[in-house]
């Protein structure tokens, strides 16, 4: 039936609130991009890694910077990020100790990225599948986060983007940027009609 005046008022308020939120997100997005200009290369490198998007890459950069040379090695970098398990061997058996103390924010960000990475067609997903049965989800995620931080180390030291043969980079780029492209086209007066993929 027809909406009452009160219902129309509430819906109008909701629409206005959503419009304000969208405008705020646009401003934050622009601010983020401006802030990342001096670190554009490192920011872009991070986003080539499965599970790491624009926001996560920016937050990671805030914590680690774009020069990792002072860490000296991937192992020290991982240890600093609390992602280097204290492992030792005894009588030919590998025993795992507790993860060392370190930068809890980087550890958190990379564990979140690991949760995203295992959902991509990548080596991270395959490694996770091999670990989760034996170690459980939480320990497997920490192991993936450890692999991610070592990947970051090698990308930054070699100045090369990440490449995984299991990923369709062209399709991933379209999926990632399509909403922004569509919005930009609509802003400039173009009519965008989405068709189902075949």
Feature roles, as predicted:
Residues 1-198:
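A detector of single, family-specific signature residues
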